[in-house]
Amino acid sequence: MNVYGTEQIRNVVLLGHGGAGKTTVAEALALLTGVTKRMGKVPDGNTISDYDKEEIKRQFSISTTLIPLEYEGEDGPIKINLLDTPGFFDFVGEVEEAISVADAAIIVVNCKAGIEPGTERAWEMCEKYNLPRLIFVTNMDDDHASYRELVVKLETKFGRKIAPFQLPIRENEKFVGFVNVVKMGGRRFTHLSDYEECEIPDYVQKNLTIARDALIEAVAETSEEYMERYFLGEEFTQEEISTALRTHVIEGDIVPVMMGSGINCQGFKVLLQAIDKYFPSPDHFECIGVDVSTGERFTAKYNDDVSLSARVFKTIVDPFIGKYSLMKICTGTLKGDTVVYNVNKDTEEKIGKLYILRGKDQIEVQELKAGDIGAVAKLTVTQTGDTMAVRTAPIVYHKPQTSTPYTYMAYKAVNKGEDDKVSTALAKMMEEDLTLKVVNDAENRQALLYGIGDQQLDVVISKLQSRYKVDVTLSQPKFAFRETLRKKVKVQGKHKKQSGGHGQYGDVIMEFEPSGDLETPYVFEEKIFGGSVPRNYFPAVEKGLQECVLKGPVAGYPVVGLKATLLDGSYHPVDSSEMAFKMATILAFKQGFMEANPVLLEPIASLKVTVPDKFTGDVMGDLNRRRGRVLGMNSNHNGKQVIEADIPMSELFGYNTDLRSMTGGLGDYSYEFSRYEQAPGDVQKREIEARAAAKDGE
């Protein structure tokens, strides 16, 4: 593959709902640019993008795949770095990594299915990152798909930015071509995406006039001169129209709508032309980071005439091909067989061979210019988000923003002795996927696996088996309850063993009551008068307390909110010891705690649920059924409602799946631990019984 300059590069991410046809679009573009000789098909398991065993088995994308294409553009050859992303939200981390290095996006929409949750999420991401985009409508070969209705829905949903650049031509209800609204000409498909000029059908004229007028109005808004000419009724040249539209697309003021058929490979030649003509090269943007040597903000255009800096945006770890670090060159030129400086790790790394990845294939290249995307194998310490530079110019870029995982399950190895193998395998998988997280819950003696959703966790378990040959089971996690008391009691604890020789004697009278602070295990005070218990035994009494609150007598959970006061007691000048007073305290605690109306406390989360307005009633009703307390609701900048509530952590188990079901995949949520509250009686009873059964089974 040739080396391309910054201005020749187009970094384009494919976005859209799962099943909309993103991978088919990638296959069609690969065919037309000579990468392949025939289009792969997802059901056949032979596409460039979906080469992983899990993707072939499940017939949908799980990881982002890079597919570089070489295309002869209007002003010379260009390189299109196509990033094919998963459509299912469980794999949103892959999408976020791809968007972080993309300079433009193609949102793929199935004409028959229309606007789906993945369409809306793709649009929101483009808005968030100010990404120029176009919408490519697939499935135009379906006789029952209405392009006109879809465009109306797109305009209603996303506003005046939507601009159809094409209108369909149908004969006998078959999709045979399109009208180019920009050039005002008919195009009839001949072979694959090739076409010939044809007459514009009369039935298109009305919609064509509306679409054309909107485009010309957008052109007029480019400058005062154009606006004046527009009001005078002057015509714009084709070059003026194309240049103005390109400006609007790059600035995000216009989102072209184009169309095609994946099955028949129609419409993709024009899509390639649009990528070349309307999408920006990286030098339209700035790299923003921090100059480590000065601590000041660093900004620079993508430019290969300065020192090297590159950002690692993705890591691939494969048991067979090894580890690859994918990076976008921000400034300078990256060459093979050189030493670079990892700014985040403050260490140097040896760059061996330099590669372009195309699906599972590695293509060796000599160098990569600013704005380009490539891969380096077997870097020792480098991870996703790290910045590679030169030691004399240490620039560090921000790590890609990835969604926080809130869905979690307990996991354990099926076979004894494989815990280390599982941990090693998961560590490698977490290098690849930043939305995966492992937490060791020592209190409940369980290991927790966090992800975006159940589907992602299912894929992880399957990959552990197929890639790393370890079997792992998932189960419902245990939740961290607490124990406390509700009334004041006064008890005696006496530890006495005196049967000849040196004995044991400790005697305490203690008061136990609520401290009012559920964030602190205990508060200890002493009110001894007259030396009934010598002061040197006070620490032993507190040690007994420290041991007791680790595991309460109700269900074995830690104790919180306890105030213990040593009031009185007695001692023996020979037989008393620190151990004896510690044991006496333990006896007093066990008796007193159970007499003081003990209760279980459950963890409460502060929850935020973001949903479209029409789903708020269903969501709030569901929260009430989950024992949640809705605290309030307000609108965010996307016009969605943000519901705030307090809810028991245990009631959030399975919430991800239920929320998606209620909102058609358009609901998001986040939560954090807030505090402990007394659990209802039935919950306490169920938990105590479960803990007792688990203890009996040990």
Predicted regions and their residues:
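Structural and coupling elements of P-loop NTPases
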Residues: 1-698
